[in-house]
Regions:
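Extracellular glycan-interacting surfaces
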Residues: 1-327
């Protein structure tokens, strides 16, 4: 079917999986991928859903046939890619973030990539890995305004299209739980409301990062540790948050807010995730279709805006699942 929805899931062990929404089995996608790929972000072209990108420990790969074949794009060796983002109006322009907090850009739909900047935070929490850019967000009304979520380095913003960055961590410095950011999303018609996900939950800024407020997910859910936050493609006042008890917990879920984060409701009603939710995907063409994945390989999908859910469990070989996309 020409309008069939495809779902893609990335794992840090055993790579990338695909299934059609109506199919019963997952396919592992390996043709052209590196050996033992560790797949992090998955990005689907907003105008051509057959074109998709994944970030791995060996750089960025592109497919032009929904994942049947893959080709490594031109990015300097040794770059582990943790985030991918399309320009909101010119999808031939793309951005990616790496482990090491480097930002690269492409002007030819990912064919070639050019170094843009490094986000330096002297107050970043020292971990066993270099600071990673786990999320990038771009303001549609003014694409020069960008935001980055750093693990474990807090939040940063740019006013010149990613060429330079300003840290916006006055409320977070010195607190590892608050500096450990996992995602960033923009809301409101002006895209001036910024939400970030961290170990404590979801925090919001109404002034582009000058100040932050804790949205206190614990008031609405017994689990509040957040692995990501996304804006609905059809409603800039709606956010989704991936939650769990902690990184490796045996409970997960999805919360949704339709009022810019003031209140939240459990969106995944009727299902029982067995581990922390790590990713959520909303079909931009059909926003009533939503999928989410858990760390241990569960995938749940709804085609009626959460009224009913179907489980699509991954093969047992799919371990440490961290990303999902659909179109």
């Amino acid at each position: 079917m020409a309008d069939e929805t495809y779902v893609y899931v990335g794992a840090e062990a055993h790579g990338l999986y695909r299934k059609q929404a109506s199919a019963t089995h997952w396919e592992q996608l390996t043709n052209g991928m590196p050996p033992m790929p560790q797949v992090r972000p998955i990005a689907i072209h907003p105008q051509h859903p057959e074109v998709l990108f994944v970030g791995t420990q060996r750089g960025v790969y592109r497919s032009q046939d929904r994942g049947d074949h893959w080709q490594r794009m031109h990015l300097p060796e040794g770059r582990t890619v943790w985030s991918l983002q399309f320009h909101p109006h010119e999808p031939q322009i793309m951005f990616l973030g790496t482990e090491g907090s480097e930002v690269y850009t492409s002007n030819d739909t990912g064919e070639t990539w050019h170094y843009l900047s490094t986000i330096v935070n002297p107050d970043a929490v020292q971990m066993a890995f270099a600071t990673r850019i786990l999320g990038l967000a771009i303001e549609p009304p003014n694409p020069n305004h960008m935001y980055a979520a750093l693990e474990v380095g807090g939040a940063a913003r740019s006013a010149d299209g990613g060429k330079s960055w300003e840290l916006v961590n006055r409320y977070f410095n010195g607190n590892v739980d608050l500096m450990d950011l996992h995602g960033v999303a923009l809301g409101s018609p002006r895209a001036d409301v910024v939400c970030i996900a961290n170990r404590v939950g979801v925090w919001r800024s109404r002034d582009r990062g000058n100040s932050w407020e804790n949205l206190h997910l614990e008031k609405f859910s017994p689990i509040a540790y957040s692995r990501g936050v996304q804006t609905a493609p059809n409603d800039s006042n709606t956010f989704y948050a991936c939650v769990g008890k902690d990184f490796g917990s045996a409970a997960g879920g999805v919360l949704r807010s339709t009022d810019l984060g003031e209140t939240w409701q459990r969106f995944d009603r009727g299902v029982t995730p067995d581990s922390t939710t790590f990713g959520i995907a909303i079909n931009a063409r059909h926003p009533e279709q939503v999928y989410f994945c858990t760390r241990r390989g569960q995938v749940f999908g709804t085609h009626d805006d959460g009224a009913s859910w179907t489980e699509h469990r991954l093969p047992e070989s799919a371990m440490n699942v961290i990303s999902i996309a659909c179109a």
